[in-house]
């Protein structure tokens, strides 16, 4: 279930806003597509990024994917636990699998993000295709 209190990007990152700070991670949809996450590259505290800027990467047993910041901001905290336990992204992408916290530089950036219902609609076709592929594998 996609949490309704978050905002989402087409690149499958999520943003939780709390005052002037935003918490960023990847969606459940993204972690399922990636498979088992084995490594995460995240920026240092103090780094600043424009909205849509690359802030790191996540490596899984399937692929390496770049991560993009949903809004412009300055990194104020990085989830250090992911260095030793990147699987938290798979286990709890909206909780203990968060990636970083940023001080928002422009609140207007959130206008380009999707609410949960719109994100669910955006990923619906992908989810159907995944279900078809899983059914084919089960019948093979």
Regions from the language model: what does each represent?
Residues 76-100:
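Aromatic- and Lys/Arg-enriched surface recognition patch
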Residues 15-17, 61, 78-81, 107:
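Residue-level recognition of beta-strand microenvironments
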Residues 63-71, 77, 118-126:
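A broadly tuned preference for mixed-charge, low-complexity surface segments
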Residues 31-32, 45-48, 72-75, 81-83:
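Short, charged/polar surface micro-motifs in flexible loops or helix N-caps
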Residues 1-54, 91, 96-123, 127, ...:
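Acidic, low-complexity mobile loops and tails
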Residues 7, 41, 59, 65-70, ...:
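Small beta-strand-rich domains/subdomains or short beta-sheet motifs embedded
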């Amino acid at each position: 279930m996609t949490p309704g209190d978050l905002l989402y990007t087409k690149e499958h990152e999520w943003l939780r806003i709390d005052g002037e700070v935003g918490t960023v991670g990847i969606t459940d949809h993204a972690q399922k597509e990636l498979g088992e996450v084995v490594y995460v590259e995240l920026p240092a505290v103090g780094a600043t990024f424009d909205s849509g800027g690359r802030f790191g990467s996540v490596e899984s047993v399937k692929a390496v994917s770049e991560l993009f910041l949903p809004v412009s901001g300055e990194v104020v905290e990085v989830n250090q636990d992911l260095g030793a336990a990147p699987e938290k992204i798979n286990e709890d992408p909206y909780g203990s699998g968060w990636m970083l916290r940023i001080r928002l530089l422009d609140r207007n950036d959130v206008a380009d993000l999707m609410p949960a219902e719109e994100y669910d609609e955006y990923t619906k076709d992908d989810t159907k295709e995944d279900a078809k592929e899983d059914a084919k594998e089960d019948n093979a």
